Swiss-Prot record:
<keyword id="KW-0798">TonB box</keyword>
<keyword id="KW-0812">Transmembrane</keyword>
<feature type="repeat" description="3">
    <location>
        <begin position="34"/>
        <end position="37"/>
    </location>
</feature>
<keyword id="KW-0677">Repeat</keyword>
<feature type="repeat" description="6">
    <location>
        <begin position="46"/>
        <end position="49"/>
    </location>
</feature>
<dbReference type="InterPro" id="IPR012910">
    <property type="entry name" value="Plug_dom"/>
</dbReference>
<dbReference type="InterPro" id="IPR036942">
    <property type="entry name" value="TonB_rcpt_b-brl_sf"/>
</dbReference>
<dbReference type="GO" id="GO:0015344">
    <property type="term" value="F:siderophore uptake transmembrane transporter activity"/>
</dbReference>
<feature type="repeat" description="1">
    <location>
        <begin position="26"/>
        <end position="29"/>
    </location>
</feature>
<feature type="domain" description="TBDR plug">
    <location>
        <begin position="66"/>
        <end position="200"/>
    </location>
</feature>
<dbReference type="Pfam" id="PF04886">
    <property type="entry name" value="PT"/>
</dbReference>
<keyword id="KW-0675">Receptor</keyword>
<feature type="repeat" description="4">
    <location>
        <begin position="38"/>
        <end position="41"/>
    </location>
</feature>
<dbReference type="InterPro" id="IPR010917">
    <property type="entry name" value="TonB_rcpt_CS"/>
</dbReference>
<feature type="region of interest" description="Disordered">
    <location>
        <begin position="28"/>
        <end position="57"/>
    </location>
</feature>
<protein>
    <recommendedName>
        <fullName>Probable hemoglobin and hemoglobin-haptoglobin-binding protein 1</fullName>
    </recommendedName>
</protein>
<feature type="repeat" description="7">
    <location>
        <begin position="50"/>
        <end position="53"/>
    </location>
</feature>
């Protein structure tokens, strides 16, 4: 920590606090009840019609949680080590709109950036995503598929929405951020900490009245987002209700230099990793929160809640890397159109009892059913008029004149056939060459008319080349349409070829006549990938609390338990369909013989276009649904106990314990099967005489190719071995010591642990390929964390300064490691390189934090309303391992010069650079106006503190290529050769200034406006920099030059404003 520099502002606040202590009143030495570090979210809302002896306490509680209340002050005696609570009022004042804004002015916590799919959870104390707990109203939120194998295979290609779902900020009453091990509250997953949300309730608004109405409109320029929120709360006799309906409609976040391209055409042509502008997406969120309560008397309450939200992203992956740049452009070959969705629906029923008994003062029983679906749909097709599949240079179009359908060109005339030598060629109505643009494959007997879209009672003008007597015509003829019926009852039309009456050597002659269609297919083939990650959670939960005195000690007891069942599954749906369909593919379809055989009767094929008639290419083809992961049901049984003990006026203890028993029950759904090739042979190989691959089966060998009974038997044997149950048990604890030696100093110590049970994909995922295979591991251990923390808080009235130091130790980190080369088929010499998730690493993070707030009015009465704030987090950490990481051993055999790099402790990319946040603000005594200035200062991420997981394939090295040792030159990154394991992209130091103000001209009206990045600073955050990929097709830049990195920069100067009416 030699580089740490103490803040001048923090020193000033400390000096001011200490200077004022001399004038402070003497301590009362009265014991102060302190809330426990609760293992689960407990309700703070009590019924408003409590017994008389509780009315004052209830009133105080309700005033504290009043969403529209004015107080933002922190009760130092209630603040826990490493814990921050953010109220709804503070979020509204800061104009927070998403998870990024939630932690914008916090230090030591950031969001994980994923590019197209947005933020994915949080990064705290060196770990991120699934290693940081997220809960909403007591329910854990969806986890990502976290296995490194899945990330290597699928995540870098944008085929899955593999993110942690977020919450609508307008629904949040409080957000509690805990840094450090926290399984006590969040259960499995909270190694680095947790973020726990509690949603609003009708009682938060109905303090002194029976109704509340609010309408809020907002707008922010960084993504052109429009906000509309309607809030209704009411109470009638024994019933109360709350409805919050929120709509957000905007587009992608505008990076710095967003308007780099001069026009829309240039914008659409800037494709691939070198694109410097954020990809165009339309992003909407619709959220509805409804809570209905029934309280027949002061001791009983029933309630039901619905929390339903959908986040949808539509747009084009212009930076998508998988396209033939050298020979094509997006205007001819198309782009990747995406439609991602994150849906969350939670229905909750609860019963509360407020009768005081020897066992509880308050008891709550709740049942919740939560369904989360993260969908990623991509359509790869060309959607413009310039696409090859819909090319129509002559502008041919269909018109109806005087009861006759005619095909005319772009000039409004008909094509003409001109005799050129021994042949005829088409000219358009202005005499221009059109022959190369007209299809030769639209004979009358191969084309049927869709009578559902055209009026088949009218005639159609066709082009006749030879009549039924084989005489040349090269002219138009108006024909009647004969109507037929398809098996589904729909009508179609046909125009039969005329046949001659005089037979010839090959039968009766028939005319040669056709439709004059454009030469292209008339549609673009849409390659659709529609993939869902589903999480369905059901929970029954019992919470009890009791306050009592025992001898000379005071106790606040919390205890209870829960049973939770979660089904996690994946559904892949891949199919091809027609997109950008033009009239000649829409109004007509193919008539062809079965198998395309000549001489057989032609029948209608509505799923085949006229252009695809020869090969029988279908417009729509569906291979059905499948999955790469077996569905797994997780059952979790939990018991918890917590007691806050006040031993004396200056000594208190937090004693908290939780027991988790997690069971994984894998299953298999035949409706969405796992492809057999992913499972067959992984445990039980095929026999030497089994032919698994090949065009033929030699004599004496057994046919075990795909879909044979032999293959299916091996698949079933391996599946049975894969479907093994696993379970994990863990004892979590959180022990705290609170010392109050004076009325201006509080000392707190915390010792806590946490665990993360492996996710189902880390245990059960399988994949098989000669270049890269993954085997399951049902013997994985749970990851664990232990946190030690000490905090010193100096305070006076509403001002405080907290200095804390922490250490977090992680064990049994799960990592993908090379296991061995293994034969799948004993009769084959091919060995598959198998990787497996194993417990490898351990890590340690140390750091210090400062949090302070100085109310200037506490020092000088004339400065009443002014306040200063300062926060800082400084942390360092490394991942340690007693043996080489995966793949290093083979690499070092040929490249021993890199031994020192491969053997050193690995930096932790999830650690944020040193961050400070300064706050200067003023609130008028009338509370009618105020403003805040936030200054965020972030240090550069040092090269030695970053890690590039692909470094062994990028440095200059020797490789064994097909048995020959060759030297491979170094990959260039940003114009320089990669020489070590340092991260390729890092942020420089930056300072950002935000200014936010509010104004209440009348009681019911509030205006809020802010300028963000006031100085228009160009900067790249560390979380955006580390999201840039070297492999895959998304979130890429041109590694050699760094072109495309501008796409990842934060927005320049931007503005937000909102207006809220309240009644």
């Amino acid at each position: 920590m030699t580089n740490f520099k103490f803040s001048l502002l923090a020193c000033s606040i400390a000096f001011a606090l200490n200077a004022s202590i001399a004038y402070a009143a003497q301590p009362t030495n009265q014991p102060t009840n302190q809330p426990t570090n609760q293992p689960t979210n407990q309700p703070t809302n009590q019924p408003t019609n409590q017994p008389t002896n509780q009315n004052s306490n209830v009133s105080e509680q309700l005033e504290q949680i009043n969403v529209s209340g004015s107080s933002e002050n922190i009760n130092v005696k209630e603040k826990k080590v490493g814990e921050t609570q953010i109220s709804a009022k503070k979020l509204a004042k800061q104009q927070a709109s998403d998870s990024r804004d939630l932690v914008r002015y916090e230090t030591g916590i950031t969001v994980v950036e994923t590019g197209r799919t947005g933020a994915s959870g949080y990064a705290v104390r060196g770990v991120d995503e699934n290693r940081v707990g997220i809960m909403v109203d007591g329910l854990r939120q969806a986890e990502t598929l976290s296995s490194q194998g899945f990330k290597e295979l699928f995540e870098g290609y944008g085929n899955f929405n593999n993110t942690r779902n977020s919450i609508e900020i307008e629904n949040v009453k409080t957000a509690t951020i805990t840094k450090g091990a926290d399984s006590l509250k969040s259960g499995s997953g909270a190694l680095g900490g947790s973020v726990i949300f509690e949603t609003k309730d009708a009682r938060d608004y109905l303090i002194d009245k029976d109704y509340y109405l609010s309408y809020k409109r907002g707008y922010q320029t960084m993504n052109n987002q429009n906000l509309k929120t309607l809030t209704l709360a009411g109470r009638s006799k024994k019933f109360d209700i709350l409805i919050i309906d929120t709509t957000r409609d905007g587009h992608e976040i505008e990076n710095y230099d967003y308007k780099i391209y001069p026009n829309k055409q240039a914008d659409l042509r800037a494709v691939g990793p070198t694109r410097e502008k954020a990809d165009p997406y339309q992003i909407t969120r619709q959220s509805t929160l409804i809570k209905l309560g029934f309280q027949p008397n002061e001791n009983h309450r029933l309630s039901v809640a619905l929390d339903d939200s959908t986040l949808e992203t539509k747009g084009i992956d212009l930076s998508y890397a998988l396209r033939p740049y050298s020979t094509a452009n997006n205007e001819k070959y198309g782009e990747r159109i995406i439609n991602d969705q994150s849906k969350r629906k939670n229905i909750q029923f609860s019963y509360e009892n407020f009768s005081q008994t020897p066992f509880w003062d308050h008891i709550k029983l709740s049942y919740s059913s939560q369904k989360i679906t993260n969908k990623a749909r991509s359509d790869e097709y060309c959607h413009q008029s310039t696409c090859n599949g819909v090319s129509n240079p002559q502008g041919l179009h269909l018109v109806e004149e005087k009861g006759v359908y005619k095909i005319k060109d772009k000039y409004g005339g008909e094509l003409e056939s001109k005799e050129i030598g021994w042949s005829h060629e088409f000219k358009n109505s202005k005499g221009e060459d059109a022959d190369k643009d007209i299809s030769q494959r639209s004979s009358l007997d191969s084309v049927l008319i869709n009578c559902e879209k055209l009026d088949c009672s009218k005639k159609f003008r066709i082009y006749q080349e030879y009549d039924e007597n084989s005489s040349e015509k090269y002219t138009y003829d108006d024909r009647e349409i004969e109507v037929g019926t398809l098996p589904n009852g729909k009508k179609y039309g046909k125009i039969p070829l005329k046949k001659g009456k005089t037979p010839s050597w090959n039968g009766f002659p028939q005319e040669t006549a056709r439709f004059l269609f454009p030469k292209s297919y008339g549609y673009s083939t849409d390659f659709v990938n529609d993939r869902d990650l589903n999480t369905h959670t059901q929970q029954i939960k019992l919470d009890l609390d009791k306050e009592f005195h025992l001898w000379h000690t005071q106790h606040q007891l919390k205890y209870g338990g829960l049973y939770e069942k979660t089904l996690k599954s994946m559904v892949n749906h891949q199919y091809n369909t027609a997109a950008n369909v033009q009239w000649w593919a829409d109004y007509f379809f193919c008539a062809r013989a079965k198998g395309g055989n000549l001489g057989e009767k032609k029948t209608p094929h509505p799923n085949v276009s006229v252009a695809g008639c020869v090969n029988g290419t279908p417009l729509h083809s569906d291979i059905g649904k499948d999955t790469y992961l077996i569905p797994v049901t997780t059952k979790n049984n939990v018991l918890y106990f917590g007691d806050n003990v006040q031993l004396t006026s200056w000594l208190g203890l937090d004693l908290n314990y939780r027991y988790d028993h997690v069971k994984y029950l894998p299953g298999y759904d035949e409706k969405t099967p796992v492809p057999g090739g992913l499972i067959a042979g992984i445990f039980v190989p095929f026999n030497e005489k089994d032919v698994v691959y090949g065009a033929y089966v030699p004599s004496g060998y057994k046919d075990c190719r795909y879909n044979t009974e032999c293959y299916k038997k091996n698949f079933e044997e391996n599946l049975a071995l894969l479907l093994r149950k696993t379970d994990y048990k863990h004892h979590s604890y959180n022990l705290g010591l609170n010392l109050d030696p004076t009325d201006w100093l509080r000392v707190q110590l915390k010792y806590a642990n946490a665990f993360r049970a492996p996710t189902s994909d880390e245990i059960y995922m399988t994949f098989k390929h000669p270049d890269f295979s993954i085997g399951p591991n049902t013997n994985l251990k749970a990851e664990t964390a232990k946190t030690k923390e000490v905090a010193f808080t100096f305070y006076k009235e509403n001002s405080y300064l907290t200095l804390s130091a922490f250490q977090s130790d992680y064990r049994n980190f799960i990592d993908l490691v090379f296991e061995k080369n293994k034969q799948i088929d004993k009769g084959s010499a091919i060995e598959y390189p198998f990787y497996q998730n194993q417990n490898r690493d351990q890590a340690r993070v140390r750091g210090i934090e400062i949090a302070s707030r100085l109310e200037m009015g506490d020092l000088f009465e004339k400065l009443q309303g002014f306040h200063l704030g300062y926060k800082l987090t400084y942390q360092k950490g490394r991942i340690k391992d007693n043996k080489l990481r995966s793949g290093y051993a083979e690499f070092l055999k040929l490249n021993p010069q890199y031994t020192a790099i491969a053997s050193q402790d690995q930096p932790m990319n999830a650690l944020q650079p040193t961050t400070s946040v300064y706050n200067i603000g003023y609130d008028a005594p009338s509370k009618k106006w105020g403003m805040d200035v936030y200054i965020t200062d972030v240090a550069a991420k040092k090269a030695k503190d970053s890690f590039n997981s692909q470094w062994t394939s990028m440095v200059k090295r020797k490789e064994n290529i097909y048995g020959t040792e060759r030297t491979v030159p170094a990959t260039q990154a940003n114009g320089k050769d990669v020489k070590d394991s340092r991260g390729l992209w890092r942020n420089n130091r930056y300072t950002v200034i935000d200014t936010i103000a509010y104004w209440k001209p009348i009681k019911n009206l509030t205006f809020t406006a802010g300028v963000y990045n006031l100085t228009n600073k160009k900067y790249l955050t560390w979380d955006s920099a580390r999201s840039v990929r070297h492999l895959g097709t998304i979130n890429r830049v041109e590694t050699a030059t760094g072109k495309g990195l501008n796409r990842f920069y934060a927005p320049g100067r931007n503005y937000r404003m909102s207006v809220q009416f309240e009644f």
